[in-house]
């Protein structure tokens, strides 16, 4: 991953996800925390350094009890339809800012490893920074293995040849029931189109792959022939 992507990823994704220090459930009923970090199943939560809002470390029993409460498995509280603020008064535990940053850093790295297992993404390290950020954005929303197996065939085929215009045309995630994906989809399309412009212009030194140009809108060089 290019340094600019690692350095600016949270700046990019935080406005799309928000930052929540306590457990809540997303629209799918999955327990989440931080900047859109899934901690479901419970084993993921138990590995984290939760502390009490009033101070002091949380015990495994306290983490388990709160996770179970927020999971709302029978949907009696209908938390997944109410947003994270509905869980504020229900929670007594939290993660510190440092713990959230560490969790996000680990997830970004693990997503990259998963992405590179897909044969069409093997050249990921060669991609322009804007394309890498778009791919990490999709992985943040769907998981690093989102394109494994036979999933996303048209998108994978475009990425295999670094056809980032094709990637832009085939990267849209399903927004049904999850309107929060609308701005992320818009950003990802923008990023892939930028990456296509970078490849088109790099030979003439208009652009370079290490630079993350987003949120600028890049244009491909215009070739004028007599």
Positions of the model-derived regions?
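Acidic, aromatic-lined catalytic clefts of primarily extracellular/periplasmic carbohydrate-active enzymes
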Residues: 1-132, 150, 165-226
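Acidic helix/loop microenvironments that form the catalytic cleft of cell-wall polysaccharide enzymes
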Residues: 135-144, 175
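Short conserved catalytic/interaction loops centered on acidic-Pro-aromatic/His motifs
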Residues: 127, 145-158
């Amino acid at each position: 991953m290019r340094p600019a992507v690692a350095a600016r990823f949270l700046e990019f994704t935080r406005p799309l996800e928000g930052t929540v220090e306590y457990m809540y459930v997303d629209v799918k009923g999955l327990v989440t925390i931080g900047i859109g970090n899934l901690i479901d199943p419970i084993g993921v939560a138990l590995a984290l350094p939760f502390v009490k809002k009033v101070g002091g470390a949380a015990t495994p029993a306290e983490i388990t009890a709160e996770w179970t409460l927020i999971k709302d498995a029978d949907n009696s509280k209908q938390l997944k339809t109410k947003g994270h603020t509905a869980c504020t008064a229900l929670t007594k535990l939290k993660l510190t800012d440092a713990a959230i940053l560490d969790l996000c850093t680990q997830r970004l790295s693990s997503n990259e490893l998963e992405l590179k297992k897909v044969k069409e993404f093997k050249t990921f390290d060669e991609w322009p920074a804007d394309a890498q950020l778009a791919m990490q954005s999709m992985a943040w929303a769907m998981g690093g293995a989102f394109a494994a197996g036979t999933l996303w065939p048209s998108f994978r085929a475009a990425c295999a040849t670094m056809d980032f215009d094709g990637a832009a045309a085939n990267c849209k995630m399903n927004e049904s029931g999850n309107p929060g994906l609308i701005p992320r989809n818009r950003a990802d399309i923008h990023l892939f189109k930028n990456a296509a412009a970078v490849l088109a212009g790099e030979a003439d030194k208009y652009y370079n792959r290490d630079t993350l140009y987003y949120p600028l809108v890049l244009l491909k060089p215009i070739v004028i022939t007599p």
